[in-house]
Amino acid sequence: MAIALGVAACATAQMSVVKDAQRAAKEGKPFSEVVGIITPALTNPETAGSSDTWMVPGKAAYDQYDKLVANKQLHMFKNAQDTINQDMLLVPAYEYYMKALAVDTIIDKKGKPKTKNSKKILDTFVGHLNDYYMAGAELYNFQKYDDAFKAFGIFIDLTQMPQLKKSLASNPMAADSIVSSTAFNQGIAAWQVERFDDAIGAFMNAIKLGYNKKQVYDYAMAVAQAAGKNDTLFMIAQEALPLYGKEDTQYIRQITNHYLQSKDYDNAYKAINQAIEQDPANPQYYVVKGII
């Protein structure tokens, strides 16, 4: 009985924490203060499994972001840091709402799945899609590259969520060309801080999403080379060769170098001969063949 009473008291205490955080959010307390209040409830099993718990800090972040949008429009921002602080709210807002979404589905007494907050969460994502793109661009321009990487990543992830496809269909910012170029920009942000694996992943995602400009292959190859990822460099060069091999011999050079380093002379000859067949008037190809 004592144990049962103790568990009940703990659950009651955690619910009180949630209510305190809700009250602080409604009073317009700083987001960091709301998070500080509710943090114990986010790790307690009695409350962490409830979507309502995660909604509190998520909503607080979005609400404060929206309020700052109005301040920005009224030219109340004093410096760049004000913009950075505003943009930085969007990342935890998304993360908390995703936590809420993950635990929002419950099974009712009839055995049917039921949600409480999902619609609000998804509607909020739709309404803030463009904000994530702008935040990424602003944070990048302020040289907050790690944070720009996160904001760009959230923008991309939102456009790929099946639940949002219909709602975003009429939003020009969700067009494939915008999304794929954002993935490229995300890669550039990672490259700026030498997060080479993340940069390569973003560049490859850009290609997957339809961004096939020459620069994405060139950046991806440069990053792969800097990271010492020769197999990745070889793979990217193979993808770029059919598209841009005629205007730039670096791709066939990388391919043949890969084979030569592993003493695979047959495939090195095969690769350059195929390139010559595709573009017999390219004198650089014969130079490469002569080197082989």
Where are these regions (language model features)?
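Short coil/linker segments at helix-helix boundaries
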Residues: 60-181, 197
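Start-of-domain marker
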Residues: 14-73, 83
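Short coil turns that delineate tetratricopeptide repeat
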Residues: 46-49, 105, 160, 211, ...
